[in-house]
Structure formats: structure tokens, C-alpha cells
Amino acid sequence: MAVSLWQQCIGRLQDELSAQQFSMWIRPLQAEMDGDTLVLYAPNRFVLDWVRDKYINIINQFFTEQMGNDAPKLRFDIGSRPSAKKPEPAPVAAVRVPSPQTKASVGTAFNTTEPVANTNHRSNINPTYQFDNFVEGKSNQLGKAAALQVAENPGGAYNPLFLYGGTGLGKTHLLHAVGNGIIKNNPNAKVVYMHSERFVQDMVKALQNNAIEEFKRYYRSVDALFIDDIQFFANKDRSQEEFFHTFNALLEGNHQIILTSDRYPKEIDGVEDRLKSRFGWGLTVAIEPPELETRVAILMRKAQESGINLPDEVAFFIAKRLRSNVRELEGALNRVIANANFTGRPITIDFVREALRDLLALQEKLVTIDNIQKTVAEYYKIKMADMLSKRRSRSVARPRQVAMALSKELTNQSLPEIGDAFGGRDHTTVLHACRKIAQLREESHDIKEDYANLIRTLSS
């Protein structure tokens, strides 16, 4: 009875939550009765804590509405419900190669000359990319949580998993971390990672060698397929056709698919609607540019791995000025470390200013309050004058608040200076705008998307 009640509760939650919230937090839950207690099993600690913190009141309220004093007690646990646990599958043959392929490597992922019956899968997962060395922050928290769940339960609730965001934000790191997690749990798993261009190259090579059946057999018999930068399938009709059928075959067999892109699935031009629709069948998660604290943590971790003692004030100095992506941060730190090694000088703020003077000058030139105002006004299709006006209609006030929040995040200007740039507003108005936008980014998918798009535009 209570399990049936949980199914009704799921229907209520699906109506009340966004599609992403429901897929991320509610869909993975499993329910089972234990005496007079309904136990909800979460796939990991992160999901358990989130559901218990955010949704337990809604769940309990629904149970009380339906059953009054007879409502079951509620308990949370981690794992799968006992009756749902399956026997371990029989291992399947696979071949690991010691040196992982990269996006730039050449050749094909499958051997067009081998017999059809001997489809050999080379696991090209990079062992250096692990969850343990992925620096987590608010910008990538959901992405990491989803990736962890996929590593623990491939082919489960988050299938396909679609990660999107700008260049250098850690999407590829998460792909390899998932692959390493799957292989750790099942060393014989057939896990294949590749850039989308490799899939296209393999298909072309298969056509040239009259080996299209081997191509199909190879890709449709993997346990997990991870494809980076799926947007490069744009306008490649034959590749899209083959991937469409591969996608369907893998999902029907409960084999895991993870895709990445630099944009939201529906915004990928040149890709068929039927594919874009399927990209959203599982879970779609944005990976955003890292916030200040995460940027500092990334720098400190990288310095530690390099055996360098990076002073806190230096890490904050770099992190406040370089905001676009992780790759840029790490590149800047590598330059600082190299200069310090060559010159023997200690790493101070003045030293960093000198070592990164061209990079810092370019960044400060690109991101100004005026540039932010113009970019936001153009994005929301309002007049530049509206940014400075006293108008309070939501169509104007909300973009103005977004621009203020971006100014605080992307420039080194103080709150009073930002207020002055927005028509002489008080610093408390700017602070309110920043807090309001931070709240809306948690609650509104549209605002979250808008903010991420503007960050990418201003940082590119």
C-alpha cells in the first residue's frame, strides 16, 4: 500500500518540480516497506542529503494528506532496495591499452580488418582523471553527483547523461572519471571514450573499407559509450543516421551513454530533432564556469600536485582575475611556476603580475562594467539606457540585476562603484541584486541558462 502511495507521490513531485530536478533527485530513488516504515533508497550520500533537505516536507505532507495518522514512517538509506539487487553479470572479454587515446589521436577505434566475430574493444579511458582529483564547487556539483551515480549504476536512471558547458570546465575529466569508476567495479567492462570527430572518422573509414557492419557491431556492443563534443555531428547526416541507430541499440540494452556539448541540446544547430530529443531522455546537466572559491581550490590543488607552496593571497589574486575556465587557470599557474623555477624568485603577487602581465591586461580589457551592460542589454533586447534608468518593470529590472551580479563576479569593482555605474544606485541595491540572482539561479532554469550563456560570452 505504502509503495503504491510512493508512486502517487512521484506523480505529484513530477508535476511540481522541473524536469531536471525530478530526473536528478527523485527518479533514482527506490522504495520498499520495512515493517511500518517506507524506506527510500538513494544511490549515494549526495542525493540522500539533498532529498532529505529539500523534499522531505513535501513527501511527508503528501503522505499525511492521503493517509492521515496512518501515514507510514519515512527512512532514508543508501544503495538499492534488497529485493531489487541483481546477480553479478557474467564477465565479458575486453582489452585495456596502457596509453590512452586523446582527442587529437589518429586512426580508428575499431579494426576494420578483424573478423566480425572478434569485435575487440580498447578501453581508452585516461587513468589520471579520477573523481578524487576533480575539484568540486557549486558550478559543477550536480554534474559530479550525476557522474558518480552513473559510475556506480551504469545504464540506470541517468541514461543518457548529457553534460554541457563551455570549453575547459571539466566535462572530459568527468567522462574519464566515470569510465574509471565503471572499470574499477567491473574490470571486464567494455568502456569506450572518444571525440565525436573520431566516430565520424571511423564511419568514413568503414565505408571506404566496406566494413560498415563491423562498425555497427563494434559500437553497438559496448557496455558504455562516452562521446565528447557531440555538436561536431552538425550537418553530418550519415554520421547522425548511424549514431541514431547506435544510440537506440545501446539504450535498449541498458548500456550507458554519456555525451558532452558546449551548449544545451536543443540549441545545437545542424543536428536532427529526433537526436536532440533523445539527448534529453535521461538527465541533462550544465557545467558552469567555476566560482571564485572553486577557482582558488583548483589552483591550490594544482600547486600541491606540482610540489609548489602557493600562498593563499596569490591564489586569490589569480582566481579573481582569470574566470573563464579551468584550463586557463591551470595554464596561468603553469606559467607562474615555470617563471619561478627559471628565476629562482618567490611567488608573490608582484611576481604574478609580472609573469602574467599580458594575460591580465587582456582580461581586464575584455571585461568591464560597460561591456557587461551592453552585452546584457543586447541579450535581453532592452535599451542600454534602461540599465541606468529608474524603471522597475520586471522586463528591465531583472536584466539590470543580472548585469549587476555579473559586474560583481567578473570585475574587481567595489559594490559602490558598481552602483555608480548603474545610474548612481546605492551599494545595498547592488548587494540585493547579487543575492536575488544567486537565488534565482538555484530556482529558475531560465535564469541559470541566461547567466551561464552571458558568462561564456563575456569570458570568450
UniProtKB/Swiss-Prot annotation:
It holds the Pfam family Bac_DnaA_C. Residues 1-84 are annotated as: Domain I, interacts with DnaA modulators. The keyword Isomerase does not apply. Residues 124-340 are annotated as: Domain III, AAA+ region. One of its GO terms (cellular component) is plasma membrane. Keywords: ATP-binding, Cytoplasm, DNA replication, DNA-binding, Lipid-binding, Nucleotide-binding. Residues 84-123 are annotated as: Domain II. Belongs to the DnaA family. This is Chromosomal replication initiator protein DnaA. It comes from Shewanella oneidensis (strain ATCC 700550 / JCM 31522 / CIP 106686 / LMG 19005 / NCIMB 14063 / MR-1).
